[in-house]
Amino acid sequence: MSTVNVQIGLHELLNGSNAQIQLSVPQLVEKVLMRNEGKLTSTGAVSASTGKYTGRSPKDKFIVKEASVADKIAWGAVNQPISEEHFNKLYTKVLEYLKEKEELFVFKGFAGADRNYRLPIQVINEYAWHNLFVHQLFIRPTEEELTTHESEFTIVSAPNFKADPAVDGTNSEAFIMVSFEKRIVLIGGTEYAGEMKKSIFSIMNFLLPEQDILSMHCSANVGEEGDVALFFGLSGTGKTTLSADPNRKLIGDDEHGWSDNGVFNIEGGCYAKCVNLSHEKEPQIFDAITFGSVLENVIINDQTRIADYNDTTLTENTRAAYPMHAIDNIVLPSVAGHPNTIIFLTADASGVLPPISKLSKEQAMYHFLSGYTSKLAGTERGVTSPQATFSTCFGSPFLPLDASRYAEMLGEKIEKHDAKVFLVNTGWTGGEYGVGKRMNLGYTRAMIQAALSGELAKTETAKHDIFGLEVPLHVPGVPDEVLMPEQTWADKAAYKAKAIELANEFKANFKKFDSVSEDIINLGGPIA
């Protein structure tokens, strides 16, 4: 199937009598309720269920193996190839399926808040609530922008269309396929809305580095003086909590680009976890869930329509989607200068990493590539004790290119803009999980505040004898003994053994990076 034929098929779909283009939020909410796709909560949000798929489905994600990208993609378990033939046949079937629908919903908008680098996109949805979701998550065009909007990438989403693995070359009924040549994302068999968000992120992770822009899975905020901070970290490390600072404005909570102009948000909204959400713990998120927001897999009371964020009957991965402007303390447009401070967050359940340490450029690249945190008991079947987990660049499921490309760009930008990088352990202290205790949140906030203010740049440090990290000896508001992890353990020999064990896990994980420079390994990794 040629690109011309793809465009003809899209044109027919977009110009069909069933296509509802660029409906407003109230119109979409009405459609959701009339079509019985979801319910209205007491705060005016739409609550919808995603059926059996309550999270991303990484084994069902494919990139079409096309001549123009075959040598660029890091093929493997994350970036699974699928043939053009399989894609073309499935695409044709999905289009025929959607043409028969009574209504389709189309959103036109952008990915990328910096106008110089933004990607015009369109999303064709079978579900009205999915269209409301993308309306809130991506960047909404002005009326003037809409008149000249020409999409450069299209998501075609048909959650009720099920693939046949024997015929379609998929692993299950669900599929998320990206064709870079045809500029199409094809989604079916799953109702989980996050697949649309993360597909565009994966695309930006391919396109932006080609323009010399580092794409990053991180949150970002900016201080009153214009000083920018990035927060990288896997799930459960405190990224959302620690980047929501009343004294700093939020640039974005999840996906960013770093260009020669500075940092920009890729999105126009937030997709926040809301398990155990309360006004006391996360006031910004709690208050943002108003009319037009989307709650995913959250149980609501049949009578009062009040959301019960503590109920995980459907999944622990309950989510809220809302536009950036639903938060008070933000920067709009979501662009800022170059980062002054970069924070890597890790929840180390072995209790051996320092609560904060300063990183050299090589150490920053090493820990960026490592993307370390701990997987705790109970999060997955078969996990009975905490396990080290490594997610390359703090976002391996979304990286189409070789990881070293992103790390090299980070190193170059750190050096060029003199960004200070810190590794912050929000995990355990005084012993491993089950013996020690979780790091005091007040101490973590004080350490991050000291890093952001520049205080730590002039603080005396000591080199950690196993990890080679520079550990500050004094941080305002934090007891000195907390800063050196060995001092918090009653059994010093047990500390050393556990630290060496983790250092060896870092080294074993790093063996997969055969294309990185020796400097990163020799100057960035553990020294014992």
Curated annotation (Swiss-Prot):
EC id: 4.1.1.49
This protein's name: Phosphoenolpyruvate carboxykinase (ATP)
Positions annotated to bind Mn(2+): K198, H217, D254
Binding site for ATP: K198, H217, G233, L234, S235, G236, T237, G238, K239, T240, T241, E282, R319, T444
Cofactors, names only: Mn(2+)
Species of the source: Bacillus cereus (strain AH187)
Catalytic activity: oxaloacetate + ATP = phosphoenolpyruvate + ADP + CO2
EC category: lyase
Pathway: Carbohydrate biosynthesis; gluconeogenesis
Biological process terms in GO annotation: gluconeogenesis
Subcellular location: Cytoplasm
Gene name of this polypeptide: pckA
Keyword Cell wall biogenesis/degradation: no
